[in-house]
């Protein structure tokens, strides 16, 4: 066997990360975000891209319409989650939220460029998911 990078094989015990994932600071941050945007729940992830990916991962695979002027990480997350991407010519969303996908019971709102007080109460229903970055 050829080892190109000469890197040792390590096993990572993910239990070691528990204090980083369930930290009181993260919980306080999530609570403050809820209070600020008017949402009932919040879940912190390391990026909005990962939130999009996780949100779409278990959904029925379909084509998702997204603005054509968007960072490439967004279509990448959609495709990696198993969906197809359809780019639309919509520049009105720039700097604002837009509906990433509307399902029967709820919608996913990509709000990576906007974070306003009471925004969730104004733009979403309790069952909706709004992604901030």
Regions found by a protein language model. Give the residues of each.
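Conserved active-site segment immediately N-terminal to the catalytic lysine
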Residues: 105-133
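Conserved PLP-binding active-site segment in aminotransferase class I/II-type PLP enzymes
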Residues: 1-60, 81
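Conserved residues at the C-terminal ends of beta-strands
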Residues: 45, 67, 133
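Short acidic donor-binding loop at the edge of a beta-strand
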Residues: 41, 63, 128-129
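PLP-dependent aminotransferase-like
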Residues: 57-111, 115
């Amino acid at each position: 066997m050829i080892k190109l990078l000469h890197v040792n094989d390590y096993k990572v015990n993910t239990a070691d990360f528990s204090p980083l994932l369930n930290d009181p600071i993260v919980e306080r941050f999530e609570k403050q975000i809820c209070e600020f945007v008017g949402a009932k729940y919040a879940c912190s992830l390391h990026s909005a891209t990962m939130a999009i990916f996780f949100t779409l991962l278990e959904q029925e695979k379909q084509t998702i319409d997204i603005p054509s002027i968007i960072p490439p990480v967004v279509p990448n997350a959609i495709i990696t989650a198993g969906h197809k991407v359809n780019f639309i010519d919509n520049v009105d969303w720039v700097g604002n939220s837009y509906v990433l996908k509307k399902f029967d019971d709820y919608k996913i709102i990509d709000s990576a460029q906007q974070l306003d007080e009471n925004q969730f109460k104004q733009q979403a229903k309790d069952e909706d998911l709004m992604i901030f970055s």
